[in-house]
Amino acid sequence: MIKKVPIVLSIFCFLLLLSSSHGSIPEAFLNCISNKFSLDVSILNILHVPSNSSYDSVLKSTIQNPRFLKSPKPLAIITPVLHSHVQSAVICTKQAGLQIRIRSGGADYEGLSYRSEVPFILLDLQNLRSISVDIEDNSAWVESGATIGEFYHEIAQNSPVHAFPAGVSSSVGIGGHLSSGGFGTLLRKYGLAADNIIDAKIVDARGRILDRESMGEDLFWAIRGGGGASFGVIVSWKVKLVKVPPMVTVFILSKTYEEGGLDLLHKWQYIEHKLPEDLFLAVSIMDDSSSGNKTLMAGFMSLFLGKTEDLLKVMAENFPQLGLKKEDCLEMNWIDAAMYFSGHPIGESRSVLKNRESHLPKTCVSIKSDFIQEPQSMDALEKLWKFCREEENSPIILMLPLGGMMSKISESEIPFPYRKDVIYSMIYEIVWNCEDDESSEEYIDGLGRLEELMTPYVKQPRGSWFSTRNLYTGKNKGPGTTYSKAKEWGFRYFNNNFKKLALIKGQVDPENFFYYEQSIPPLHLQVEL
């Protein structure tokens, strides 16, 4: 008992100092935290307030989009190291009448995981990043604060023929990636990352830790691509690992307009979704100014689950116009291919995947997306190419093939609905130097003009990846925003699954504690239809 006295005094003095120094932090929150951590010295290291030397570094550590560095800051940041810390954070934030924001990797394009227009507590999960791989069971448990790179590295340490169908950006947090769907180069073979979730642990609005069995199948359905932060704090996930061959083949082949790049892109639309599932063939349109002059390129990027000789046969049979040659191809194992598509130089140590900060320069970015149901005309593609060529700051266009496994999964299997009727998706991205603050709106307006340009050529109503959410699409006006109002943006991400998400939200979080600008609103059928 005597040994506990210094600990209790240390915690008491720490919290007393907080209450006297930060009148903006509600006393109810500090009192609750004091009670929850009365004998837990870890509070000294996991609670960060503006007067702490650690506050700014923790806040900025995983802000991937510097557009929001000047946004209103949280009253406090909690960086839990135990699941019980998450429970305490949820209970105390709710009791104090504050909002909570949940951040795993900070890659949210709108910064919604770490900013708010009203006073809030930031729950940063970066210290919850344990990974346990079970090769015999073809599964793994991974905590939400781990990055895609850390997860890939751990899989490769255990097996050269196992993988997971997640994205290519190694610094993205697993929590946000899985709960928003998660697409990558294996989606035609194995579907989305969220299609391969088999269990999860969530802290709900009542502070309870629930697994798949105790949360029930409805909530488990919702968090697999429906935006986990609308329903609770998912602290860990159990996922299914997939098989890959010992060697895969990759290539990136770029063509200018004069080299037939646009004609090849037009042809690609007719074959990409019909190719064998083992072949992922995406296309980008972007400015290659390495020569000093603005030059648009159509870049064909591929991952093939097999060897070069087999890939050449598939391409000769399905897309001979591209003219792929053996010397264009590189053979490597899957983990090195993941590094290749993440932008790491060939031969770089795999240990760089464990670096939580992106190896790429941080730039301001805004993004939108569409799903395409039928090939676009040459006229539409000509207008798109012309727009990209004439814009002073050319957007990046990424076209991702669907088909394969994506066409075999029901549109209601998980919240992500865009399956058999979609042949590919288009992602529009504008990137600029963050020091050019005065031109930010101009760049964002340019993205809006591009979206408007594509409107006649895109099936209506439009659909978008939830992971590319954009507040210009629409947003909640407060925790009282109704389902009928939220449909204006919600159907774009989830189509007819949006109503089911709202009904589940009404069951598990009727008071809408887990609210943010594009969270799922609770739908109570007896009140609102």
UniProtKB/Swiss-Prot annotation:
Its EC number is 1.21.3.11. The keyword Flavoprotein applies. Keywords: Alkaloid metabolism, Disulfide bond, Endoplasmic reticulum, FAD, Flavoprotein, Glycoprotein, Oxidoreductase, Signal, Vacuole. GO terms for cellular component: endoplasmic reticulum; vacuole; vesicle. GO terms for molecular function: FAD binding; oxidoreductase activity. Gene3D superfamilies: 3.30.465.10, 3.40.462.20, Uridine Diphospho-n-acetylenolpyruvylglucosamine Reductase, domain 2 (3.30.43.10). The keyword Oxidoreductase applies. One of its GO terms (biological process) is alkaloid metabolic process. Its cofactor is FAD. It catalyses: O-acetyl-15alpha-stemmadenine + O2 = precondylocarpine acetate + H2O2. Glycans are attached at N52, N293. Residues 1-23 form the signal peptide. Pathway: Alkaloid biosynthesis. InterPro entries: BBE, FAD-bd_PCMH, FAD-bd_PCMH-like_sf, FAD-bd_PCMH_sub1, FAD-bd_PCMH_sub2, Oxid_FAD_bind_N. It holds the Pfam family FAD_binding_4. It is found in: Endoplasmic reticulum; Vacuole; Vesicle. Residues 70-244 form the FAD-binding PCMH-type domain. Disulfide bonds join C32-C92. Expressed in leaf epidermis. Disruption phenotype: Accumulates O-acetylstemmadenine (OAS) at the expense of catharanthine and vindoline. Strong accumulation of stemmadenine acetate. It comes from the Eukaryota. Belongs to the oxygen-dependent FAD-linked oxidoreductase family. Component of the seco-iridoid and derivatives monoterpenoid indole alkaloids (MIAs, e.g. vinblastine, catharanthine, tabersonine, vincadifformine, vindoline, vincristine, quinine and strychnine) biosynthesis pathway. Converts O-acetylstemmadenine (OAS) to reactive acetylated intermediates, likely dihydroprecondylocarpine acetate. PANTHER family: OS08G0158400 PROTEIN. This is O-acetylstemmadenine oxidase. It comes from Catharanthus roseus.
